[in-house]
Amino acid sequence: MYRRLKLVSVEKRTTTATVDGKENVINLCSNDYLGLSHNQNILKRAIISLKQISQCSSRLIAGNDPKLINLEEKLAEHCETESTLVYPTGYMANLGVITTLADKNTTILSDELNHASIVDGCRLSGANIQVFRHNDMEQLEHLFEAISCWRKKIVVTEGLFSMDGDISNLQQICRIAKEQNAITAVDDAHGDFIFGEASASSSSRFSGIPSYLGVNNDIDVHTSSLSKGLGCFGGYVASTRQIRELLINKSRHFIYTSALPEHLCVSALTAIPIATKGNLQKKLFDNIDFMFRKLSQLGLRLAGKSGSSQIIPVIIGDEKTAIEFSKRLLDNGIFVQAVRYPTVKKGSARLRISLTARHGRNQLSSAIDSFGTVGKKLIII
């Protein structure tokens, strides 16, 4: 039952991969939701930038490349915030901002299904941590009442939850946090550039779940990733200029690490206007609706609501059965990883499907057929 690293080589400009030597496998594990890692214009710009010499330094020494500043300005426009700060990864962005804003005199209220980077940031901060049941606003209010004597309070959640594919109850969280004079922090790595207002200005279109739910201005701290909606690499924090300056001077996860290389900044800068056009999101949600409907018709137990997001968890329950299901799918040319404890709760092992805008209908139909075949053999259906 120990985890094992599979050897995965993604095929060029396709949604297939070679997995442990098995070729032409349909890849349903990628977080490249809009398929931009294959975009030729982005790749050409990155290749040109690779000819430049990287500073190979932290930003406070010699690594503050002009392209990083350009990227941060574009991301601030995208999020409609005063400023942003780019980190090497989304994981480090969460650790950096939480450990900077919270200390032993702070209480953090955290959704029980928050990502490991949020959990780790909370623990490292030394704050008093109160965990509330997933999206349970009644319990969140009760916890706030119990900690009313604490001066500094932060409520942190994901926008789109990475293992369940459902959306945070951000409207209620923002209301409660405002009443309690608490900071609201949202990690929207999986919703950024996928969800949002399609009618917004070009720079802020698809700026994530907060925008989608109409509470963007009520969020104090946004964190996100450049490796999902943009298909690039890196992470960032979007907030006020004051918080940006605080992070530059206090965040160990920013100060003591090398800066994001120029070619990755150029890739993200090139990807932003492509990602915000809207045509790729339409293709993605067409695939989501089709996949969710067909899997439901098979009788599989799916988490989340119909067509709610690009993350579709097929709940198996038993860990060994989930691992065997994944193995048999791979034998059938379908790559879907089994996710189990401690990533998810015991007894809730699942197959986590990640859809992209590049998946063809024939590929999805083939995957659905394989789910049906394997599900019947394992008596899941």
Task: Tell me what each language-model feature is.
Residues 1-53, 182:
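N-terminal "arm"/small-domain region of PLP-dependent enzymes with the aminotransferase-like
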Residues 32, 130, 134-186:
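Active-site phosphate-binding strand-loop segment of PLP-dependent enzymes
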Residues 36, 282-292, 296-333, 343, ...:
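Conserved PLP-binding catalytic core of the aspartate aminotransferase-like
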Residues 40, 66, 77, 331-332, ...:
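PLP-dependent enzyme catalytic core of the Aspartate aminotransferase-like
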Residues 44-89, 288:
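Conserved N-terminal alpha-helix of the aminotransferase class I/II PLP-enzyme fold
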Residues 97-116:
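Conserved PLP-anchoring active-site segment centered on the Schiff-base-forming lysine
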Residues 197, 202, 211-246:
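Active-site PLP attachment segment
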Residues 259-276, 287, 296:
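Structural motif of enzymes handling amino- and sulfur-group chemistry
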